[in-house]
């Protein structure tokens, strides 16, 4: 079996991934900007956000790798980075976020999503790496990955999957560790309503794949 790097050399993505390699249409840019402004106001007034360590972020591209407690986590991380919502993509479960055309269209208006199969296979992971590479090569863009693979119920850290480390090594980009504090109290897994409360994002030192 070929290594991931060998498989990537001549890998061609299907047309369904074209959205990752081009500038979003005007409607998408407007929706992302409106969503970003809404989030800025929301996390200033209702769930005040504190940011620690933003100056540690390296030049793009990089992988922002964080614990995962809530559906609000991606917005928190993008705001903490401060480079704009369109400069990030999130890894998203293919069987949930991409199995419905309406859901896929709606969510991609607000954020960039890269599909990945929950069940690992060499072929599906090569496809994911190729899609990620295309996105990261288009302007100053970065990736958000949650190494636990799911949201925590109580804020406790779960076991890590190896995916983020493989992406960093195969694409030659650093991992920036981050820790989100408080989001599991504001919007816990399984709840519809968001509770008011403070949240904080701690950003750590980047880790380079050759270190």
Where are these regions (language model features)?
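Serine/threonine-rich low-complexity intrinsically disordered regions
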Residues: 1-3, 24-25, 121, 208-209
């Amino acid at each position: 079996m070929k290594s991931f790097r060998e498989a990537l050399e001549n890998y061609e993505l299907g047309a369904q991934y074209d959205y990752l390699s081009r500038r979003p249409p005007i409607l998408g840019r407007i929706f992302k900007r409106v969503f970003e402004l809404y989030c800025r106001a929301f996390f200033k007034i209702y769930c005040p956000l504190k940011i620690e360590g933003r100056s540690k972020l390296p030049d793009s591209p990089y992988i922002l790798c964080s614990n995962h407690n809530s559906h609000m986590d991606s917005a928190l991380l993008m705001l903490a980075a401060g480079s704009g919502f369109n400069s990030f993509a999130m890894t998203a479960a293919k069987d949930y976020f991409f199995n419905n055309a309406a859901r896929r269209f709606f969510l991609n208006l607000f954020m960039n999503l890269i599909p990945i199969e929950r069940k690992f296979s060499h072929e599906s992971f090569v496809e994911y790496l190729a899609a990620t590479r295309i996105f990261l090569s288009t302007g100053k863009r970065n990736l958000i990955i949650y190494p636990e693979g799911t949201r925590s119920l109580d804020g406790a850290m779960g076991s890590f999957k190896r995916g983020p480390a493989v992406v960093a090594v195969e694409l030659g980009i650093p991992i920036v560790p981050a820790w989100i504090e408080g989001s599991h109290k504001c919007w816990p897994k399984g709840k519809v309503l968001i509770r008011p409360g403070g949240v904080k994002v701690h950003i750590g030192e980047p880790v380079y794949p050759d270190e």
